[in-house]
């Protein structure tokens, strides 16, 4: 039995983690085996890389270094967590995956999408998410929510232009491959967002049984 790989994407303050947990609870209530994970991170080694990527520092990190660290963490995450869970037939719900790399390192940092695609193929082979939920909201709302959480990480400290590019890249990717992506209006109340997820649940269950 092959599992199902679902990723949750979106900019800062979009509520991905909260809604990932909600979706997991709904799937588990239907008897589905669910594994929750996140990127960067998901394993002890990858979590240490996450700390390098997110911690504010006086030493500037080059965009290429950032990109390579992201894919190094992803390689470990795939080998240790994601591929084994899919092989067991589980549903993997991952907070961010390679779409975030295209959005943040491609859109935000301005790195070539061809360079990202080459690393994607090297690290992932043919593995791609079965479904990606993009939690979209205006940049100013997302940044306001992120600021309300407290101390900002290295990415959250970026300026408005960076996050405009991140959001645009997510939306471009969703438009280019509508069969894989579902857009969720994350500017709504949490109750309304979760009502939207409830409408997607039958489709997720069908894919899982598929």
UniProtKB/Swiss-Prot annotation:
Cellular-component GO terms for this entry: cytosol
Residue positions binding ATP: 10-17
GO BP, one annotated term: dTTP biosynthetic process
InterPro entries for the chain: P-loop_NTPase, Thymidylate_kin-like_dom, Thymidylate_kinase
Domain of life of the native organism: Bacteria
Protein task: Phosphorylation of dTMP to form dTDP in both de novo and salvage pathways of dTTP synthesis.
Family in the record: Belongs to the thymidylate kinase family.
Protein name: Thymidylate kinase
Organism, scientific name: Pseudomonas syringae pv. syringae (strain B728a)
Native organism taxonomy: Bacteria, Pseudomonadati, Pseudomonadota, Gammaproteobacteria, Pseudomonadales
Gene name linked to the record: tmk
